[in-house]
Amino acid sequence: NITQTYLLVFVDSKMYIYMDGVLQTNINGSGNDYLTVPYSAAEIKEIVWTQSADTLIICHNDYVPRKIVRGSTHSTWTMSNMTFSYYPTYDFNRDYDSGTFTCGSSNPQVGDTTTITCSGASPVTTDHVGGMFEGNGGVVRITAYNSSTSFSGTVLQEFINNNSISGIDASLEEPAWSAAHGYPGSVTFHESR
């Protein structure tokens, strides 16, 4: 809520919660007087945060953005990774121009799971999971790495023609936010969102 004030004290891997100058104990019924957090003492000075009512969002370039939410009592706090319906993707390593992509399903529809295979190049890595494949009008959210030449995903937009997609006409994108490329280092609320 907007009437209660807390002091959150971050130290190496822990967050202590004070209300009206009193340390809150037995956080989440754990017997601990702290909430475990992933940030080391050195990383604490690098976190950026924003807060709205009972929700605090924390960013650090080495971690998935975290959401800390106060529950129904002064000692009920949860921390979770932020989940995003949409996030940026980017083609970091365009090494498949000489390849040809083919779809394992004939005419897959929006929502279908399909497998895409590349011949003539081996561009697929585990870093592509969560990214996008685009070509011949179709868009697939990559959900699984199968091999260096194959991945599976969910069709978001149907292909005009999925028989053969030239590497030059395709885009194989990784999530822009990842352990390999880093995570957002800044955060804010805009219009209460």
List the model feature ranges, each with a label:
Residues Y18-D20, I68-G71:
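Hydrophobic/aromatic beta-strand positions that recur at structurally equivalent sites within the blades
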Residues Q24-Y34, R70, W77-E173:
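Autoprocessing Asn-cyclization modules and mimics
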Residues Y6-G29:
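Beta-propeller domains
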Residues Q4-F10, D54-C59, R193:
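Short beta-strand elements that form the blades of beta-propeller/WD-repeat-like
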Residues L7, M15, L56, P65, ...:
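Hydrophobic residues embedded in beta-strands of well-ordered beta-sheets
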Residues N1-T3, Y39-S52, W177-S192:
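Structural signature of eukaryotic scaffold interfaces centered on beta-propeller domains
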